[in-house]
């Protein structure tokens, strides 16, 4: 039996992708399955009071809607729900950020 490939209407898309460091937050957008990242932009972390504000600025600047899912690496250990950056003042709850973004799923990983 042949299956058709998923479409951009896949419920897990679009996705917000990121790499967050103490100096910069790099964001990108994945519109659908198999699509490469687009709307790649680097924002200075110091210009934003929180990760949520930085993400909102990215989405607004790029003219993007709400992502369905999000994932980003961050320059600190992720051992539970509360994330505290060691080289920047941002601190957040993964659960609260997921709710704020309105995403179905949020994955935050230590980027080593």
Show where each model-derived region lies.
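Short beta-strand-loop/turn "lid" adjacent to the catalytic site in phosphate-handling enzymes
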Residues: 62-108, 112
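Short glycine-rich, Thr/Ser-proximal phosphate-binding strand/loop in the N-terminal lobe
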Residues: 2-60
